[in-house]
Structure formats: structure tokens, C-alpha cells
Amino acid sequence: MNIKQSILKILSDNADKAFSSAELCKLIGTQKTIERQAVKDVLLQLTVERAVLCDAKSGKFRSAKADGTAVFQGNKRGFGFLLIGGGEDLFVAAALTHGAFNGDTVTYRKIPDTRDCAEVLTIVSRGTTTLVGTYDKHNGGRFVVPDDDRFISDVYIPPQKDMNAKHGQKVAVKINVFPSDNRDNPEGEIVAVLGYPGSVDVDMEAVAVSYGLTDVFPQEVEAYAAKQCKLIGEKDLQGRKDLRGQKIFTIDGADAKDLDDAVSVCRNADGTYTLGVHIADVSHYVKPSGEIDKEAFRRGTSVYFPQAVFPMLPHSLCNGVCSLLAGEDRLTLTCQMTIDKKGRVLQSDVFPSVIRSVHRFTYDQVQLILDGDQNARAEFCDVCAELDDMNALAQILADKRDKRGNVDFETKEVQFVFDGGKVVDVVPFKRDFAHRLIEEFMIAANEAVAEYAQTCGLPMVYRVHEKPDEEKLRVLLSIMSGVGIDVKRSKEIHGTVLQDALEKARKTPYFYLINDVMLRTMQKAKYSDTNVGHFGLASNCYCHFTSPIRRYADLVVHRIIKTAVCGKMTEKALAAYEQMASSSATQASAREKIADEAERKADDVCKCSYAETILGQTFVGLISGVVERGVFVELPNTVEGFVSAEKLGAGFVFDKERFCLYNDAVKFGLGDKLCVTVASVNKQACKIDFDLAIEKSQQQSID
């Protein structure tokens, strides 16, 4: 055994102890001066490699055996956190980050005699290799200042690597060299010049690049997709039920192009309904391990920005041959259900099919028909009876889900109005029952497919949603109690408890506030190859089946189900799908998280762009959050800003139980109205600051 191996074995066998170099020499058995020097040289090498740790005070060495692997989250002040999960995030002092940058996956060890402190040992993989920032070129220096202040170092740009970017422009930079510690700058090259900041188009492109989003596909993927865009032939129709004579139609947003679901309904003589949910058969065109499939797996999901879409599949597929366009023959996978008057699914069947949609409806058109608009009903008289039956069935399904404990949150969706590179208005988007109608039908199909897979013992990508964390639930109930809403409590967390709380809140001025806090209390839904149910939907068995154009998880579900219903589920196929379900669930969950973050960021940037147009204007909003350093205020159009405690006045105390700031004269609590003026906007940090518009003593008299 050589010296290096001997040192590592001694330290590994005594992981809780530290040794001086002299002690290690004695244990190894080295006696000569040259041998002792060799031990010291090896210790220095191992310390540089982070295989051995050296205590700065005692000079003793100990094993660098890792306690685990985690993602490092940086902070502009140099320190960081290790995101462990389960509420166990660890603090890393600046001196102990050892070259880790925001987003990196690292190994770490917990520091003895501390509760929540750790040291980074090694970098497993870099989380950020391309970032967006502002080019800073002056006095001979060339650096990119990252937009994300969690990435603590500016990136040095060598000569001839700046693409002739100008000082102050937004650029994308690829990092080629990372330093061994955070005292030096990373080195990179500019790969795209986005333009000068100020235009919302430049801002949106910056968000897209920072999250690695693009609507451009590799040439080989586009070429392969183009080959799929051919007329449906007799071979394509083999083994499919021909539903082209049925009244099947799509209902989507006015701007939607990737129409992946269509519906039909028939009211039977015995009072039951036959509901058909017909989903684009993307699996017919995208084969496992092909070029399109590899790219779709990498992307995981389509991402939607206010003025852009970054699709999972090439446009020739998602907007073309896979999109269920009216009057066009399309290959589909149909889930057909017989449902009784109580919303019970008496029978369900899944089979390959071919359809021809008779109408391409928008939600607004359908809502007009459901509301009895005479012009709309006259224009679409051929399907009014079917839409009326759909309306009745959707009400039945919604009532049934509510009774079993479905928690029906109201999401704050908005539409942005653009003009001249600016956002000039933010308009809250109202969801009417036409949206709920499609939602109910999709949920019914997703449940039926998941239950079929579970009953047959098939591998599956389930959509799971665990119960909320009990501590977060306690905080929620405390907030509700603080605003005078009494909630029944039970030992077992059940959706009916939260549903009851939401209904009580609906009758108060605090509804949207409680709705938002309750949403944050929920666990994040994710994909899994193991079924644990879906808490929010009060469903014991659930999957995503209805959007294979834009979600990779749905595409995998289609492959599994289609193979099974066509009688082709061999042992070899079963084993392959087990592996596919596991890897796809992990990838789809990870990509969904990135997509959600990117979409939120895009919305926040648009709201900041709008806020720049209303600087100095005054509005009345509701306090949506209270922290020790101030209050968050949300305007009626969902734009949120911050009023610092200093602006509220002196002597304020933070009451964390009642979530309010108060002094002898006034109290600022959740849901209170506040008159504010838009003071400043930091678009890069997505932060809006408000000032009080009137004296604090007068705030509570706002009507």
C-alpha cells in the first residue's frame, strides 16, 4: 500500500478523528526525513483535491468523506445554502464554498458541533454553463455582470471572445473555465448579443436564454419531423376505430395552435352519458429513442411566455399533423367512458382511433352558447344539444369531485397588452365554466387511464400530489384565525378541511389572500412511477394522458397504454417501459420545475415592464404578505410591490402569529387595504417598490 492509500485508509477508518502529519507518519511507519516529507507532500496534494480536510487552527487532517450530495444556491454576499429538501437546507459560509457557484451539484460534509452548517467538498456537476448578463467593457476590462445575483462572480471575457458586443448590452455568455475557488473570476465567451435593455423583447429573450429555452430544433430533428407530415394512409388506419362520423370538436384558447384534445358526448336512453376524450396520437409519429424522441425527452415540456412558445416538438408536428384541426383527419387515442347521473364511471375503454373534428371552438364561443346567446346558438346549432349535454355532465363531475374533497383553487392568470416594446396593461384573466367543462373531462380521462394501468399492473408515469406539510398547514390555519376565519380541524389532513376553509374565506375580503397562502402550503405535484394518489384532486389514482404534444410524461403514458390495449405488452416491452416510466418521471418533474420558474420569471418581467409605465401613479391594493422588514401590496391587476418598514414609520413591531406590523397608532395586517404610489422598478431583480401615498394614520380609513 503506498503513502496516499495509507493516509486515506487511516482517515477513513477514523472519520471522527483528526491527525497531525507527525501522527500520520507514526501510524504509517515512516521514519526517515525524506519519507516524512513525502507524507507532507501527499497531504498537501490531497488537501488541494478536497479528498482530505485540514483544520486551519490546529493544522490537523481529517477525512473529507461526504455526508451527501445537494444543489448549491448562491447569494450575492458570497455565502450560500445547500438545498437538501424536507426543510433541512444547510448554510455554507463564503470561505467554505470552495468554488461552488449557484445551481452546482456538490458533495458536502456537515460541520461538527453545528446544527445546520456545512462545507462544500467537491463539484459533481455545474448547474450553470450559460448565463445572461450585461457586458461591462471599460478601461481595458471585459466582463459580463450576471443578471442573476446568486451567481456571485462576474465572468471575464478574453480578447476576441466578445462578438463585438457593446458596453451595456445584454448578452449570453458561455462559461469555459471555472476557478478552483470563488476568489477568481470564471472565464467565458459571449455566444449571443441580445441588445440593449429596455425593450420587453430583449428582456424576454434574456429570460429564455437564461433557462436554456429555444424554439429552434436541431436540423436532423426538423428533417425527421418533416418526413412524418404526410397524408394518413390505409396502413395508418389499421387497428383503429373510425370515429370520423361523430360530432367531435375541440375547445381551446383563441391563440392555441397545438390542439391535442377533442371531446364528444352522447346522452343515452337510460340517462347515462357516453363521454369521449380523443387525444392526438403523438406516439404514432414519435418513436422511442428516435431523434425527435431524444429532443422531446430533453425538453420535457413546452414552455409558454406571454408572446412566445418554446415547444417540446417541432412545429410541423405540434401545430401540424398532430394538431386536431377542424375538417382534417387525425390519428388519436380515445378514452371512452360511460358515466351515470351521480358522476360514477360505470365503464371505460381506451383504443386507437381516427377522428375529424367538426369545429374549432374557443372558450369564449362555448361560454356564449352555454349562456344562451341566441346568435352563438344559431351559428353552431348543429352541436348545441351536445354542448348542453356536456354542460350538464361537467356539472355532475364537478359536484362529485367537490364532495370527495377536491380543493378548487383560483389561479390568478393575467393577459399582457403590448405596445412599442412595452407592456402597457395587465388584465386579470377570468376563467368561466367553459374552461371548467374541459378540465372536468380531462380529469375524468386521466383518472380512467391511470386506473386501467394500475388494474392491469402496467408500468406507469403517475401524477402524484402528496398531503401538505403539517407545519405549513399550522401556519395557514394560524393566518386564517388571525383574520377571523374559524376552520374545523381534524387529526387526518383531508381535502374537505381545506375546501371548507376556502369556502369560508370566499365570503370575506381575504379570499384571494387565503387562496394564495393555501396554494403555497400545498406540496408540489410531480411525476412518479409509484402511485401515492393526488391530494389536491382527491384522486386515488391519477396520471397525465391528455397533452402528449406538450408534455413528455403524457407521451410515455400513451406508449404504455397503446401497447397494452393493442395486445403487444411482451415481457421485453414490460421491462423497457418500467425503465422508461422511471427515467421519464424524473426528467419530466425536473423540466416542469424549470418551465414553471421560467414562466413565472417571464410574467414578473412583464409586470415590471408595465410598472415602469405607471411610475408615480397611485393605487389602492391589498396587503398580500407581511415580514419583519415590511409589507407586500398587491394591486387589483395582480402586480405586487414592497413597502419597506422604514416607509411605514417608526416603532413597528412584527407579530408573527397574527402576521401584522403594528405600533401604538396603527396596524398593517394581511388583507388590509393600502394606498400606495409606484416608486421604483428593478427589472433585473424583478422587484417593484411602493411608497405610502397618504399618511399611515389615514390608511385604515380607505374605503
Stretch-by-stretch model annotation:
Residues 1-276, 283-328, 658-669, 675, ...:
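Charge-lined substrate channels and their catalytic hotspots, especially those that engage the 3′ end
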Residues 26, 178-179, 196, 205-213, ...:
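Electropositive polyanion-binding surfaces
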